[in-house]
């Protein structure tokens, strides 16, 4: 048995987890079609990419067969890149490209009934005899949910990668000539997300020696990060070592965090945007040294006006943050949006009497992994969803004065 204590500003909740057969659902996500014939049920909307596997997307579709008139019911899971507004679909222009899609016929059912997950068992108890469970297994080379931040004057839905579970009534699963009316569909948007690895490795280190005109010896620069992965909202510590053997003067140090967004669709295009830049007035004279740590903090709140910046996908009006680094196995091609970060340490060196002719910058770059930690509550949900924890007891809250 595990005991968890969750604290917020209003109460302390003691959560006890055990192994058992009874199952208790905290929340169910439901969407019903306009005609009321079908309803889509999911137990969660965030599905975790564990690099070597992805959470199974499992749910239930409720079907009222009395008004189908011989039609069938299907459900699909689609990963798509949206690069335009839905409003343009009315004139025959679709600005949405499916990266991956899978369809399942739900009614009439085909084949034998598969083993239900604990989540589906709970949903079936809620839905009743008209429920039909479904499961999708996403491949590991799909991108995560990422949106491209619109500009201050942009309207409509943001561009980016999204995931959609959709149930619909039709004669065929995928017929371009068949018109499926909106009242015959219901859909729920979900997210595919990644969390920071449990084991944080040592950070990157880079060094360079650079010579200058009118100077016999170089400037040595070494920069390193304390750790490989930093969490959103945490300060990033950059350790800098400088040995100025030249006759030049280092006027100041500039540290920048850049976001690299690689959009892979018909071609591969990379967009680089600074998300944090700080200048430090450290002067290192000729034949002097410096060893010091500096802190910077990239935040979305300081980049709200930057159009095209990658942010983590969100549902409805939830708060979000800068897009997390995309982790992959490296041996599979990935389409969509791939996000990475780097830290640039730049020494601004004075040119002396000849100005820019004899002065130059000294720069090193460090790869940075920027992600969110896995919340304890998500860990509990994952264990529950996988069947490793099959009931949850919430003890009445202890009020805090």
Please provide the spans of the model-predicted regions.
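Compositionally biased, low-complexity segments
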Residues: 12-14
């Amino acid at each position: 048995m595990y005991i968890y204590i969750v604290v917020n500003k209003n109460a302390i909740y003691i959560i006890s987890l055990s192994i058992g057969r009874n199952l208790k659902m905290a929340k169910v996500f439901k969407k019903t079609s306009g005609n009321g014939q079908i309803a889509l049920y999911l137990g969660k909307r965030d599905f975790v990419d564990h690099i070597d596997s992805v959470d199974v997307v499992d749910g239930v579709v409720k079907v009222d067969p009395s008004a189908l008139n011989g039609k069938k019911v299907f459900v699909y899971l689609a990963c798509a890149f949206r690069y335009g507004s839905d409003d343009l679909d009315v004139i025959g222009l679709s600005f949405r490209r499916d990266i991956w899609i899978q369809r399942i016929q739900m009614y009439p059912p085909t084949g034998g009934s598969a083993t239900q997950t604990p989540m589906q068992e709970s949903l079936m108890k809620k839905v009743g005899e008209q429920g039909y469970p479904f499961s999708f297994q996403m491949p590991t080379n799909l991108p995560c949910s990422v949106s491209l931040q619109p500009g201050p004057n942009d309207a409509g839905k943001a561009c980016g990668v999204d995931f959609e579970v959709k149930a619909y009534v039709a004669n065929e699963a995928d017929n371009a000539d068949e018109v499926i009316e909106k009242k015959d569909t219901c859909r729920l948007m979900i997210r595919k997300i990644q969390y920071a690895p449990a084991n944080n490795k040592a950070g990157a280190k880079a060094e360079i020696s650079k010579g200058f005109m009118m100077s016999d010896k170089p400037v040595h620069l070494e920069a390193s990060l304390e750790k490989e992965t930093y969490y959103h909202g945490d300060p990033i510590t950059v350790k800098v070592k400088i040995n100025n053997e030249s006759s030049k003067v280092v006027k100041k140090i500039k540290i920048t965090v850049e976001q690299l967004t690689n959009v892979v669709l018909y071609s591969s295009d990379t967009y680089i945007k600074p998300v944090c830049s700080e200048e430090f007035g450290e002067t290192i004279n000729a034949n002097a040294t410096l060893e010091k740590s500096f802190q910077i903090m990239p935040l979305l709140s300081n980049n709200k006006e930057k159009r095209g910046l990658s942010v983590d996908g969100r549902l409805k009006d939830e708060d979000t943050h800068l897009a997390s680094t995309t982790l992959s196995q490296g041996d599979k091609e990935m389409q969509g949006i791939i996000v990475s970060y780097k830290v640039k340490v730049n020494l601004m060196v004075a040119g002396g009497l000849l100005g820019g002719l004899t002065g130059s910058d000294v720069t090193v770059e460090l790869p940075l992994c920027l992600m969110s930690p896995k919340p304890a509550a998500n860990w509990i949900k994952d264990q529950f969803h996988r069947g490793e924890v099959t009931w949850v007891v919430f003890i009445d809250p202890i009020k805090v004065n």
